[in-house]
Amino acid sequence: MAGRGGRVLLALCAALVAGGWLLAAEAQEPGAPAAGMRRRRRLQQEDGISFEYHRYPELREALVSVWLQCTAISRIYTVGRSFEGRELLVIELSDNPGVHEPGEPEFKYIGNMHGNEAVGRELLIFLAQYLCNEYQRGNETIVNLIHSTRIHIMPSLNPDGFEKAASQPGELKDWFVGRSNAQGIDLNRNFPDLDRIVYVNEKEGGPNNHLLKNLKKIVDQNSKLAPETKAVIHWIMDIPFVLSANLHGGDLVANYPYDETRSGTAHEYSSCPDDAIFQSLARAYSSFNPVMSDPNRPPCRKNDDDSSFVDGTTNGGAWYSVPGGMQDFNYLSSNCFEITVELSCEKFPPEETLKSYWEDNKNSLINYLEQIHRGVKGFVRDLQGNPIANATISVDGIDHDVTSAKDGDYWRLLVPGNYKLTASAPGYLAITKKVAVPFSPAVGVDFELESFSERKEEEKEELMEWWKMMSETLNF
């Protein structure tokens, strides 16, 4: 009885804290809608999903609503603040929220990087509510995902830009108003241009991954980086993300690396070493969206060049070159593979169309999330069973390595096939293993590395044994 009372009190306290947080947010937010507007929105909900645009206070309210409904599998946190002080909110869904469980991969969705591209923002709010609802209903797919994956959802990377775009009168919004952050910075051109570094390294030799290793301080000191950009860079570097998607608007296509062309031309297919798996990941999204994958779909605009589009996917450089983009930054600075998904021809479509966008994208969002459980996964440990962090996992024939996380766990996304994987770490002898990879689930391959000191001791013992044997044989 006391335990039940304690749980009720805890829930009540949580609700009061959340309510106070929301009231404070609305009091300080000049664009907050009136109470009557909020009541109207609640009347238009289905399964807790309000198919309407959420201004900043309403976004917070929607995330808190999910958290209060599914406290056991969710938490809300912030990675930083926008230039105007709005929080960059994330809702996490996991069977152990707030904790990296060894062997469990980390996934992220990011929306609304361009503030006037609003569909992704709303879809991610809807997705959080949907995952909560379906988990409580016992949906096997969703339950398995939440029990085996740590899912991070950031509905808006550019809340300042969204507020500017949403403040325009009428349904027809300007194509560019609110695209940039409050400083006028295009966030998807604001990341360190690691493509240029890796293109030089391809020719002259050099690292093929983690090109910002140990350079967090330099990022903080770079005055050209927006606060939103810096916050996401730290997020990417601090959590061992495996897979990600960045949701945009203005077209209908799933875009994969590289985004920036090698030659500097405007259009050129720019494959990365993991071109095969990236093509497969992009198709995993587009193929479940009936509009995006329709081969007879006309271009969004009369003069659009969609010649690079195949099955609703495109290589970024083949479409148009983007220097300083977040997608390639993920791939070249961390273990995270990210694609960019363009969700709608209109950037800020009428509110009444949001439900149809959800219906078109719901299965794609879930199917793409499931792709994190492909390829190879495992642990790198020493002979005593201690985890080895930052061990390098190399795949023969693919010039892009990944590294193990702090618990020695690693994940390597791959298409089906036969591979040779090598695990190595400073001070240890490398080990190579052969592995046959199916489509899914991921194959478990663990590595136990012997240190050089252990090998020397072993060789010394072998030499002593040999000397003893020779002494006995020759009667020394």
UniProtKB/Swiss-Prot annotation:
Its membrane topology: Peripheral membrane protein
Cofactor annotation remark: Binds 1 zinc ion per subunit.
Alphabetized Pfam families for the sequence: CarboxypepD_reg, Peptidase_M14
Protein name: Carboxypeptidase E
Record field: transmembrane: none
Top class in the EC scheme: hydrolase
The encoding gene: Cpe
Main localization category: cytoplasm
Glycosylation sites: N139, N390
Subunit description: Interacts with secretogranin III/SCG3.
GO biological process: cardiac left ventricle morphogenesis; cellular response to dexamethasone stimulus; cellular response to hydrogen peroxide; cellular response to staurosporine; enkephalin processing; insulin processing; insulin secretion involved in cellular response to glucose stimulus; negative regulation of branching morphogenesis of a nerve
One function term, GO molecular function aspect: metallocarboxypeptidase activity
One GO cellular component, as annotated: secretory granule membrane
Tissue specificity of this protein: Expressed in brain, heart and anterior pituitary gland. Also expressed in pancreatic islets and adrenal gland.
Residues at the active site: E342 (proton donor/acceptor)
EC number: 3.4.17.10
The species this protein was found in: Rattus norvegicus (Rat)
Miscellaneous comment text of the record: An autoantigen recognized by serum of pretype I diabetes.
InterPro entries: CarboxyPept-like_regulatory (IPR008969), M14_CPE_CPD (IPR034232), Peptidase_M14 (IPR000834), Peptidase_M14_domain (IPR050753)
